[in-house]
């Protein structure tokens, strides 16, 4: 992968949300923190043809197992599903389309805490737009957020109003995508949260909000716990709201308390299902990530591992290859998988589970304003009662009818509406 310095950001105007200690670099268009000695360097996504040829040859050379002995996905990704994916990937898929899409936005890298961090930074043309940093999870990437960049930065062209505009910052997690892979331990969600605070300070934003789901939620909520004065509020689509007594009962396989409301019982059942049927991927990556050499060496191995994220998300991801109605296209799915392959980040991204010290879904004690969008096909749909206890300053809660783990990706129009509503009260 070659790094070049010929990508130009759109011209922008300074506004009240930008620190006086920053300037706009004439070459890159990015904000530069005058107090920081670390430069913000333009970045271009570019892979050689030889890498794409090698990918195709590896797909075609796959050694296939016999089909599963059941007629469903209870044993894992079904052979017919992954073979349909392989056929499309090898014969019809075009990486250059998403590469061009990525390069249509200003991309940058900057060194934070010894690591080169990649991020997309798109500033709105509208004055007083609200800066937002949006963090992906696993098995996601910055590709998850591409569909919401233009609606957020240019709301008047996408059914919104000027007052709903955002300046958008989308970083790649360390060891993911185009960010540098850590060569030593210690890059866990707390450290990443501190790095994101540094990034927003380096970009010169003295007032901003943050959003995340999956690992992005952990990072975003920890930013909320750290509560730098610049961070006004956060939004999450996979909130950490489960009360300690409920979480303890679920971990120890106790029966559901009789006092749960219908919404709480639904959440209980979803988490119980996830702990019993959907946690294997996280347990493997959390205990022995380096053992997963197969997903680093085989594109089909990587694709199957990503498809089988968890049983509930598997339905959302894999159904496009099973000729079912879907919100994600075949290209959507393969854009993301191919990014993992070309950047060689299958194992480096898995190590985040090994590094992690945050308990899944456990309340973290965020005291700043929080907005929650609860999607029905998420790992669990957080009840409002739990959200109110977890977040004393809950400024927005909406229980959606459609959408799941990849909400911004699969339901980008609905997700955009949620972003506009979530932060309306703090602008």
Give the residues covered by each predicted segment.
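Non-catalytic accessory segments flanking enzyme active sites
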Residues: 51-123, 128, 332, 341, ...
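Glycine-rich "HGGG/HGxG" loop immediately N-terminal to the catalytic nucleophile
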Residues: 95-97, 160, 173-187, 221
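Short beta-strand element of the alpha/beta-hydrolase
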Residues: 129-137
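The serine-hydrolase catalytic nucleophile loop
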Residues: 138-150
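Conserved hydrolase catalytic core segment
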Residues: 151, 155-157, 205-256
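Conserved alpha/beta-hydrolase
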Residues: 152-178
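Conserved acidic catalytic loop of the alpha/beta-hydrolase fold
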Residues: 190-208
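C-terminal subdomain of alpha/beta-hydrolase-fold enzymes, centered on the catalytic histidine
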Residues: 283-427
């Amino acid at each position: 992968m070659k790094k070049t310095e010929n990508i130009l950001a759109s011209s922008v105007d300074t506004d009240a949300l930008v620190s006086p200690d920053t300037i706009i670099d004439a070459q890159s268009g990015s904000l530069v923190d005058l107090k920081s000695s670390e430069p913000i360097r333009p970045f271009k996504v570019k892979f050689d043809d030889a890498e794409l040829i090698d990918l195709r040859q590896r797909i075609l050379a796959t050694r296939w197992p016999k089909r599963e002995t059941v007629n469903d996905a209870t044993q894992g990704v079904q052979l017919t599903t992954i073979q349909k994916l392989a056929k499309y990937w090898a014969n019809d898929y075009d990486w250059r389309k998403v590469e061009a899409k990525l390069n249509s936005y200003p991309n940058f890298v900057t060194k934070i805490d010894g690591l080169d961090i990649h991020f997309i930074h798109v500033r709105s043309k509208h004055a007083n737009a609200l800066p937002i940093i949006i963090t992906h999870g696993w098995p996601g990437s910055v590709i998850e957020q591409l569909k919401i960049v233009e609606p957020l930065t240019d709301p008047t062209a996408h059914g919104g109003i000027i007052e709903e505009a955002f300046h958008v910052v989308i970083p790649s997690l360390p060891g993911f995508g185009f960010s540098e892979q850590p060569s030593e331990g210690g890059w866990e969600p707390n450290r990443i949260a501190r790095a994101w605070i540094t990034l927003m300070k380096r970009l010169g934003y003295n007032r901003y909000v943050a959003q995340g789901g999956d690992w992005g939620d952990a990072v975003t909520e920890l930013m909320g716990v750290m509560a730098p004065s610049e961070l006004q509020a956060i939004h999450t689509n996979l909130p950490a709201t489960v009360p300690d007594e409920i979480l303890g009962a679920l971990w120890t396989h106790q029966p559901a308390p009789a006092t749960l409301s219908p919404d709480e019982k639904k959440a209980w059942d979803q988490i119980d299902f996830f702990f019993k049927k959907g946690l294997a991927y996280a347990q493997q990556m959390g205990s022995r990530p380096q053992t997963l050499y197969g997903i680093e060496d085989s594109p089909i191995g990587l694709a199957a591992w990503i498809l089988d994220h968890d049983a509930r998300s598997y339905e959302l991801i894999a159904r496009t290859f099973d000729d079912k109605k879907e919100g994600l296209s075949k290209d959507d799915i393969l854009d993301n998988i191919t990014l993992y392959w070309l950047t060689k980040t299958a194992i480096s991204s898995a190590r985040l589970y090994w590094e992690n010290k945050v308990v899944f879904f456990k309340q973290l004690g965020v005291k700043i304003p929080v907005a929650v969008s609860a999607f029905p096909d998420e790992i669990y749909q957080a009840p409002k009662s739990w959200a109110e206890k977890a977040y004393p300053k809950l400024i927005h809660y909406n229980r959606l009818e459609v959408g799941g783990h990849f909400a911004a990706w699969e339901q980008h129009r609905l997700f955009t509406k949620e972003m506009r509503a979530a932060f309306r009260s703090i602008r």
